[in-house]
Amino acid sequence: WLIAGMLAGRKYFFLSGKVFSMISEYSVPRRPGNNSMGVNSIDVFKMPRMAKTEYDRLIEDQYICRIAFKGDLYPHIAPFLYIFDGRFMYFLSSNYGRKVQYFRDNPLVTVEIEHYSPDLSLFSFVSLPGRLVQIEDPDKKREVKERFVGLIKSRNLSPNVMSALGHSPEEPVEALLQGEKNSVWKLTAVKVEKIMGLKGHRSQPERPA
């Protein structure tokens, strides 16, 4: 049998004749600047910030990101292929799924890109808050899609990537240039002062081979 009682701000549990005491969080005085473990926040090691040239290089070198949408009750995060033209990021979205509705409901998002070595001796990541807009101009859409075709070929990506872009893996990559099975999104309204780029201590991301 378990009998629980409250005495002088402590919780006592009587089990098999033994008394266990758990100090209530309300009975432990907290000092300003200290967390619940008693470690002063001033002692916490902070990861180094990335310079603009560093996170620009990270964005240029990678091609997979995560986009966080506002969602309903919870935020919704989805992975995307992207291309970067040195100024803007573009994404190819299949025309189905919750991400499409979340984009229509609220185009304000945060894009996250990361790089890390298998043993985490090197790692870095950057988050970019901004606004997604859908590209409607036919010429611009084709230009961006052609760059995605080039990305998939140059990175030697599996045909399975086509299934994430609204196409069958059995289709040639050039099928991205035909039909309306996907949409082109562009990240805009990114303010440099809102970009957060962090890296591991002494990390220097290596360019992919």
Task: Show the residue positions of the predicted features.
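Short hydrophobic targeting helices and cationic amphipathic motifs
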Residues: 13-15, 27
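Helix-adjacent hinge/juxtasegments
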Residues: 98-106, 110-133
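Charged, gly/pro-rich active-site loop segments
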Residues: 26-33, 38-39, 44, 122-209
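Short, solvent-exposed aromatic-acidic interface loops
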Residues: 94-98, 149-152
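Short, basic/aromatic recognition patches
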Residues: 39-66
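Short beta-strand segments
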Residues: 62-95, 111-112
